[in-house]
């Protein structure tokens, strides 16, 4: 009986001790929380006084940076997908659009210039180009003929002009011979003496 009594008293004593310890811990914890809150309020007031961002402002800034980072990662992912599937990137689209705008401006400028030329009777760019190409072809042909003429002269061949003169001379001789043969045949047919018999 006394053992049971002692055991109950011991349990009761330990319960009271643990209860007081819990109360003390709770009180200390509450004091720490209060001190921390006071410290935070003081820090907040200091930040406000000296223009530093508050904890809330820091949180907002951090969230904004995280959103920005997520957006950049999304753009990088999209860029990689476009690259993988051969679609132009935002930058490439911008460059292409600028290039198309420049081409369009250039075409409009050329059309305007063409209209001015037409109005004032100047040859167009296309007409100038055709004229220039024609002149270049003519010049090339002349240079080729000069080169051929020099080769003929160097190797003793007659030039195109000399060939033409020679050919005309040969044709005249042939015509003359044919004429003489015809006259000879007429004389013979009508019994006149030929130039040879005369």
Swiss-Prot record:
Residue ranges with Acidic residues bias: 100-109, 170-179
Positions of modified residues (D-alanine (Ala)): 49, 84, 119, 154, 189
Tissue: Expressed by the skin glands.
Chief subcellular location: secreted
Chain residue ranges for the region called Disordered: 24-198
Maturation propeptide residues: 21-45, 56-80, 91-115, 126-150, 161-185, 196-198
Compartments it resides in: Secreted
Residues annotated with Serine amide modification: 54, 89, 124, 159, 194
GO BP terms in the entry: defense response; neuropeptide signaling pathway
Domain of life: Eukaryota
Keyword Secreted among record annotations: yes
Name of this chain's protein: Dermorphin-2
UniProt lineage: Eukaryota, Metazoa, Chordata, Craniata, Vertebrata
């Amino acid at each position: 009986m006394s053992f049971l009594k002692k055991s109950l008293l011991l349990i009761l004593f330990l319960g009271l001790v643990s209860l007081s310890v819990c109360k003390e811990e709770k009180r200390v914890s509450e004091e720490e929380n209060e001190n921390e809150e006071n410290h935070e309020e003081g820090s907040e007031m200091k930040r406000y006084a000296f223009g530093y961002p508050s904890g809330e402002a820091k949180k907002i800034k951090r969230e904004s940076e995280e959103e920005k980072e997520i957006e950049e990662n999304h753009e990088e992912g999209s860029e990689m997908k476009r690259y993988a599937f051969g679609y132009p990137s935002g930058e490439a689209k911008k460059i292409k659009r600028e290039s198309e705008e420049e081409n369009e401006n250039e075409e409009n400028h050329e059309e305007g210039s063409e209209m001015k030329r037409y109005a004032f009777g100047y040859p167009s760019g296309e007409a100038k180009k055709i004229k220039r190409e024609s002149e270049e072809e003519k010049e090339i042909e002349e240079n080729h003929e000069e080169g051929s003429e020099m080769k003929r002269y160097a190797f003793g061949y007659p030039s195109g002009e000399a060939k033409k003169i020679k050919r005309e001379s040969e044709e005249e001789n042939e015509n003359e011979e044919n004429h003489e043969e015809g006259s000879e045949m007429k004389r013979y047919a009508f019994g006149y003496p030929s130039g040879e018999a005369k």
